């Protein structure tokens, strides 16, 4: 095992190692830290000349093809203290390429919980300063259920009450297409949710609360031809228009 000055600790590491004049490459990589497990078909660091290492963030082009990689947000919390108690876990598959300051993936698959399966395009700019890093996600195909959505949102915004969400959002399987962008402390998302009881347009944002002790969340929902009877468990209501907001 080894630990860096920030407290990140590697528990196990195994790989085939190669090096030539243009890259350093690890094939069949396995890495385990205190919370996460990384599996990658390859991890590479490309350069045009040796002294590029002096400007690692901008000039070293990284590449990695992850499979069955488990990311626990407590690992990220080593470098981003606001996430140090966040126990959300993601199972990641897909290829990521770029220098540290501009990482991108055209098609990344992320699974969370028992029912959430996400395919996204990702652009991450601004690392290694995690607090000011800008994230941009394009949701290509998202399949999930509302209880898991509420659980994910509450893991980033502890003041968000899942019970409030359950009162106005039906517990059904849904497909989401849309975008999300922002920093770890301020995220905005908009898109369309497709369900068997109707389609819902949403706008959502998490942001620091006024007291600076955590995050608040704001959600606006609008729908037409939504099965209000299903939501309210009432046979007296049929399809209708819904517009509501949660803060």
Regions found by a protein language model. Give the residues of each.
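Extended amphipathic, helix-rich lipid-handling scaffolds
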Residues: 1-113, 130-247
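Long, contiguous interaction/targeting segments characteristic
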Residues: 116-118
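Conserved two-metal-ion catalytic palm core of "right-hand" nucleic acid polymerases
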Residues: 121-122, 206
């Amino acid at each position: 095992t080894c630990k860096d000055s920030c407290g990140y600790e590697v528990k196990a590491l195994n790989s085939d190692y190669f090096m030539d004049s243009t890259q350093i490459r690890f094939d069949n990589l396995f890495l385990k830290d205190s919370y996460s497990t990384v599996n990658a078909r390859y991890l590479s660091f490309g350069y045009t000349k040796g002294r590029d290492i002096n400007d690692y963030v901008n000039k070293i082009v990284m590449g990695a093809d992850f499979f069955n990689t488990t990311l626990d947000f407590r690992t990220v919390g080593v470098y981003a203290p606001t996430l140090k108690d966040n126990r959300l876990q993601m199972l990641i598959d897909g290829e990521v390429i770029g220098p540290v300051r501009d990482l991108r993936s055209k098609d990344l698959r992320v699974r969370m919980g028992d029912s959430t399966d996400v395919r996204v395009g990702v652009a991450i700019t601004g690392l290694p300063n995690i607090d000011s890093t800008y994230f941009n996600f394009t949701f290509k195909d998202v399949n999930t259920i509302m209880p898991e959505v509420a659980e994910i949102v509450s893991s980033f915004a502890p003041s968000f009450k899942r019970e409030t969400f359950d009162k106005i959002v039906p517990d059904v399987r849904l497909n989401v297409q849309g975008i999300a962008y922002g920093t770890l402390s301020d995220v905005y998302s908009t898109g369309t949710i497709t369900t068997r009881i109707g389609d819902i347009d949403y706008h959502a944002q998490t942001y620091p609360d006024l007291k600076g002790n955590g995050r608040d969340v704001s959600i606006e929902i609008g729908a037409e031809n939504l099965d209000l009877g299903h939501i309210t468990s009432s046979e007296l209501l049929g399809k209708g228009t819904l517009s509501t907001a949660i803060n």
